[in-house]
Structures are given as structure tokens and as C-alpha cells.
Amino acid sequence: MNAITIRTTGEAEIFISSETIRPGHLIELDDDQSIHRYAAGHTKLFADGTNAAGSDPRTDHVAVIDHATGLMWAVKSIGDSDGDPMSQADCDKACRELRLLGYDDWGMPTRAELAALVDDTRHEPAIDTSLFPGVLPRWHWTSTPCAWSSASAWGVYFGHGYVSSLRRLSYGFALAVRRAGQ
């Protein structure tokens, strides 16, 4: 799906089909010309199909939508069937095979997408645990390869928030992501 994302800032307003988009709102214009409007922030998605604002204190949700980026994230670190870390290729496969909330188009995030989840005010894990309660304070793979070696890819360490390159055969976890609204 090709989509255009427009973020308003300051005093700007955008008028589309007689609808006003205010500062801090996110809109997406899809190929079929449908318009999706979102307030800035997060929405928690529960396994039973219900949802709640990101500020809701419950932590039994299975996914979260980040309206600033338009991304939907699974909220639990993905490892092997025993919950252990895996190679980058195995993490990528596990993300692509994920079936969650009726969606089958999950994948691994890019370096920029995953690094944006790091919360510098937190430690072990360095991520907002009210939104991502199941993220382990360990290395998490991205889909971004390293320019200098096809044997390496980028990862984010959620223990302290580091971003670094790792050999693809090293062991880590994954956070699955997809574009919301698809």
C-alpha cells in the first residue's frame, strides 16, 4: 500500500473533504482515497478485539498502534518456542509467520523504527513498559543490514538503549511491526 502521511504542527490546519485536521493529528490518504484520522499518541489493542488509549493502565494488550508513525507493534519479544534468543534470519522468519489480531503481514522493523522506541529515561528495559510490557532487556534485531558486511545487521539493546551492529548469526529477539490501517 502506498500512503501519504501528513503531520500538522504549530497553528497549521489542513482541510480535506471539509474535515479539519488539527495540530498533533495524523492523517493517512490510502490508494483508494480513503482518509484515516488519528489523534497523536498510542492505542492499546487487546486479543479480544477491544482497544484502549495508550494511557490505560492495563498491560495485558497484545499490540499497540503508534499514531505518530502509523505503525502497529506486537508488544512481546519474539524468541524461539522456548523463549530463547535466535539468529537474525530466524527472528525475521518468526516475525513474517506471526498471526496476530487477524493480520499476517508482520515483519521486522528497520533500525530507525526500532531505535525510536528507546526511552532514555528508562533502564532494563529502556522502553515504555506500559506500552511494551513484554519486551526483554536484551538485543533485538532489525531488518537493516550493515553497509560494510552482509554478515551483519543492526540491533537495539533494550537493556540500556544501545544501537549497534551484530553478526547475523548472533542471538537476539525481535519485535514484530506492521503498518496500521492496511
Residue ranges and their predicted role:
Residues M1-G107, A112-Q182:
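Glycine-aromatic-enriched surface loops/turns that form tight recognition elements
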